[in-house]
Design a protein with these regions (language model features):
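Short, well-structured beta-strand/strand-turn elements
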Residues: 122-134, 206-207, 331-351, 461-473
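C-terminal structured "cap/appendage" subdomains that terminate the fold
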Residues: 433-473
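Carbohydrate-recognition loop of C-type lectin domains
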Residues: 4-7, 12-20, 24, 320-441, ...
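Extended assembly-interface regions of large multimeric machines
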Residues: 1-190, 455, 463-473
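Acidic, glycine-rich low-complexity/disordered segments
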Residues: 144-204, 237-238, 246-323, 389-448
């Protein structure tokens, strides 16, 4: 009998084949066989290939079982859900505008006018047109001279408008005791803009508006809440309660209507001029709506990346909906504010000078973000999160980040005989790569510039680059 064993941990094809060959050679029954002959060689190839594929399949499957090694988006999203983390969908770009209607000189003008939800505004970014719209109804009162300045419920004249196309999906609840799945076949949905209405029947006008689970203060069998989760194929699934202890379940025969925005995400950011596409009708006459931009559009984002989910899901689970440690603050902010690219948080005892009873937050925004947007984000963090989830005696203070700029002088040795590119095109390639390197590795907090890493990647750009040197200032 042979004494040689096959190494089960060696998954490389050539090593598997060599191991099988050595295993068979050790058996006296195959002492005179030529294992490099075409017949036996083909058989060994098949055996090695089969073992190689099976080993890789088992390895891949095991990797997908853990959040930190999973590569498929569906696996990462599934693991995040087990931690109670809501993976962010696309986010519609948001702008603030001051809207007014001038009725001066109009006799019998009303004391109050109304701007309906869904009023559209057009704009363009880099030559591409986008449509923004209101998501709620706003009112304005006559200031005495016929000017109507629209305001929010809080009394602010900054009206939020959001980019996207309004879409509606209708479902009929069937006769079944099993959990029904309501799939929204749209990868561009901004789930935060979704509204869910449940009608008594397909033809009824009576409805109940369900609210997102995150907005519910208490949950019982009669609480009308819904959730929207990402499915393995990239679409989104609408879910309701079980009707027993965790939220109300729609009855058989009910009609479910979901309205939401399908958005282009970051493409519509940095728009600063908006024009109303329609007039407002008052007493049968049409009047134009004047829009003055208070804050350019920002915050639009693609759906959350795999690496972002991998990083934030465990942190969000650790926070347990409270803000105590610096990691809690970072997890909550990064999970809820797509306009923020990075966050640094430290306590008062870590500050210089020491300042007990405070938590310091520094927010990093994309280049070009308006100051009004930064201020609004800070106010939202305080009012919606630190005041409700933080410790009462801890005061929040925001600190502007300090940008550090590096001036690089890069020299390289170039051999034109080793490439088809010219010296000028190679210089441009290196310049573009350096920009990409900084954007990828350094435009966030707690990052270190390592010159050796930069030079190593520059040398690998083209065989004609024999060596490179870098001076920093």
């Amino acid at each position: 009998m042979p004494t040689t064993t096959v190494k089960s941990t060696d998954l490389d094809f050539d090593n598997i084949k060599a191991s099988l060959k050595n295993f068979l050679k050790a058996d006296t029954q195959f002492a005179d066989y030529d294992f490099d002959a075409s017949g036996l060689n083909n058989i060994l190839d098949v055996l090695a290939y089969n073992t190689h594929v099976n080993g890789l399949t088992a390895n891949f499957a095991l990797n997908e079982a853990f959040l930190n090694t999973a590569q498929l988006r569906s696996s990462v999203v599934s693991h995040a859900e087990t931690l109670g983390y809501e993976v962010r969908s696309r986010v519609a770009s948001k702008a603030l505008v001051e809207l007014s209607v001038n009725l001066s000189g109009v006799t019998g003008r009303p004391a109050q006018i109304q701007l309906n939800s869904g009023t559209q505004f057009t704009t363009s970014v880099d030559g591409v047109s986008y449509t923004f719209r209101t998501l709620e109804t706003f009112f304005a009162r006559d200031n005495g001279s016929g000017l109507y300045q629209l305001q929010t419920n809080e009394g602010s004249s900054d009206i939020p408008i959001f980019e996207g196309t309004e879409k509606t999906k209708t479902f009929l609840v069937g006769e079944t005791s099993e959990r029904q799945v309501f799939v929204i076949p749209d990868t561009e949905i901004d789930t935060k803009t979704a509204t869910v209405l449940v009608f008594d029947t397909a033809s009824s006008t009576n409805f109940i508006q369900y609210t997102p689970l995150a907005e519910a203060s208490t949950i019982d069998k009669d609480t009308t809440v819904f959730t929207i989760r990402e499915t393995p194929n990239g679409f989104y699934e609408l879910n309701f309660g079980d009707g027993i202890s965790f939220g109300k379940k729609p009855d058989a025969g009910n009609k479910v209507v979901v309205t939401y925005l399908a958005t282009k995400g970051p493409d519509a950011n940095l728009a600063d001029t908006f024009t109303a596409t329609s007039n407002i009708t008052i007493a049968g006459a049409n009047y134009s709506i004047t829009a003055v931009t208070s804050a350019e559009s920002t915050g639009g984002a693609l759906r959350q990346s795999i690496e972002s989910v991998r990083q934030l899901a465990p942190l969000a689970f650790a926070t347990q909906q409270r803000m105590v440690t610096s990691a809690d603050y970072k997890a909550v902010i990064m999970s809820n504010f797509s306009a923020v690219t990075d966050t640094a948080v430290w306590s008062g005892d870590q500050n210089i000078p020491v300042d007990y009873g405070k938590v310091y937050i520094s927010l990093n925004f994309p280049t070009g973000t308006a100051e009004s947007t930064k201020t609004e984000t800070q106010n939202n963090i305080v009012s919606n999160f630190t005041d409700t989830l933080g410790i009462m005696s801890i005061e929040t203070e925001f600190v502007d980040p300090v940008d550090i700029f590096l001036e690089l002088v890069v020299n390289f040795d170039f051999d034109p005989s080793l490439t088809g590119f010219t010296l000028t095109s190679t210089e441009n390639s290196i310049y573009n790569f350096i920009t990409t390197f900084f954007n990828r590795n350094l435009n966030t907090f707690d990052k270190i510039f390592r010159r050796s890493n930069l030079l190593t990647e520059i040398d690998a750009l083209d065989p004609a680059i024999l060596s490179s040197r870098c001076e920093t200032k």
